């Protein structure tokens, strides 16, 4: 499997080198100045902070589920191995299918609606995980919901940020994605701790709480 992954990465590297255009940097200055400019942008644009934080919380909820799913599936009544968990991961293709639709309709339906809808889908997923966590049906249904919900939240928060300052689009994306993965790491840490202390119910509570916080931020900000 690792050899296959290595081969695929090499193919991707060649394709990226051959296909993507060579763009000249639009920032002049030292690397240290470039890094400092990230904090300047974060301070300058409140919308960047808003979008980054609520997306990070939702991603923390998302990652909290995937970080502990293998532990859950190894227990009764499943006694399943990593192969089954990998097959469940294929359900995530639902997010990839909906990504195109979401991207096309952000401007028409609005960031606020997509964030609320995505958070509600995630909360519904955690409800399924809580009520039917010992059955494949609710687990699969929850995976579909949590993945589509995450796509709604990520894309609707990320895409509008590029319009804040087109000349600094790459740096703005760096800030967003850094916050995004910090949120994912936090969710993984919290869910792992919750699993050790409280089992699956602790994971469900942690994931639902992170999503609820993301939704509350959206409702309070009203944007």
Report residues per predicted region.
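Pair of pore-lining "gating" transmembrane helices in MFS-fold secondary transporters
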Residues: 44-64, 140, 144-148
